[in-house]
Amino acid sequence: MRLVALRTVAHGVTPAVHTENVAYEADRPYEVAPCDPCDPTGQSDGLPSDSDRVERWASTMRGIRAASGVVLAHDMEPVAVSGIAALERAEREAHEESLLAAGATLSKGAGRRAHPEPPDPYRTCFERDRDRILHSTAFRRLAGKTQVFVFPADHQRTRLTHALEVAQVATAVARATRLNVALTEAIALGHDCGHGPGGHASETAFGQFLDGGYDHAVWGADVVFAAMNLCEETLDGIRNHSWSRPVPATPEGVVVSWADRIAYCAHDLEDALRAGIVEVRQLPQGITDVIGATRSSQLRTLIGALVGCITRRGVVAMDEEAADALAALRAFNYENIYTRPEAIAQASAVISVLRALVEHFSEHPDLAPGSARRPWGLDSAADPVRAAVAYVAGMTDRYAFEMALDHLGWDSARLPTGIDMPALRPARARRLLSVLVGGPEAPAPLPGHAPSAGPYQRMVSSLR
């Protein structure tokens, strides 16, 4: 197709665009500011004005309506894709049979769910699982949950960025070794959705309330994702991704177990280096000589080692030299990052907060929001303690600490160190800000007059 019409029009003229195969016009007129011949943008600095940007954005509200009855996203020549039949699920499953390695998990014949569902016309069962996890509330909340640092700096990892990096490592390995990429990605994205606020300290906090303790992997598969009706292979991989758990039932699940360890060892070190907690010169030579000192070098080497072992030996494992270097890196991180005195103090404060919240909401389930009285389908009336654990475990770091201030009346000094108090929204912060706008004894506005809305008043309103 060849675009043959004008691309800009004067004010009030609807642009008509014609190609050899389709004609269409904009859904509404839009205005183009008069142009200076020496400055076609109408701006002396060559940049469009704010009003121009707003008008152009508004003109795209409903897209470009084509004469053939379709709507185009861009006021430009359509990109032609002709002679294509939809690639349906059954055909893609057949492709898997010819592409994937022996022993890989095939989508066809797999994907048993607790509650049977009709198949999707285009997506495999594991692609549906991946999409459900990706769009879930539990996955989004990982953005507000600790990886290593409570309330990390902008460039430091959260549980969400960790999950994304695990998915990248795992799918790189799965693709190179002809395993099921969609299943691998689903397990990787969902593997940490059972974590509570404050990182692994939450497992210690919640463990005393539950028979058998609290394991984020098991909790994620059996509680958080229970209502999503995921495939048994996906749930198995999530439930058993930790090395202390039984071996996953699929090779894709084992790949995620390795990818999780590879990713967090490399990126936790990088975050600690940037935070000034450790220095490169502290790394043992047994690490740097084998896998390097940077995240990119470590990922490249360890992914290559895993792929190489799988393709040479036919088992999801790693040769000893690389595995020993990974183990040494993990030990270094434990000694210098995870168990440093500041980290232990932070974890202790997190445990105190979470235990107090569970006790509070198990004794007063009516104080939780209505939707939170049956978290993940658990009935607070039938089992108030387990329901309280589920409610608190679903909180982000920030929300849990707000609850401690608002519901428990805690002083901020009891919270984990490093928390940015102005970023929270507790009643304590509102009371503090009320002093800035006149305090509780500030005179009431005259009848018929609204109170002034200066910057401090607007700040207080935004915290409500």
Give residue spans per PLM region.
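Conserved catalytic Lys-bearing alpha helix of Rossmann-like short-chain dehydrogenase/reductases
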Residues: 163
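Histidine-centered, transition-metal-coordinating active-site segments
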Residues: 1-160, 170-173, 180-182, 202, ...
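Aspartate-rich (DDxxD/NDxxD/DxxxD) Mg2+/diphosphate-binding motifs
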Residues: 183-209, 217
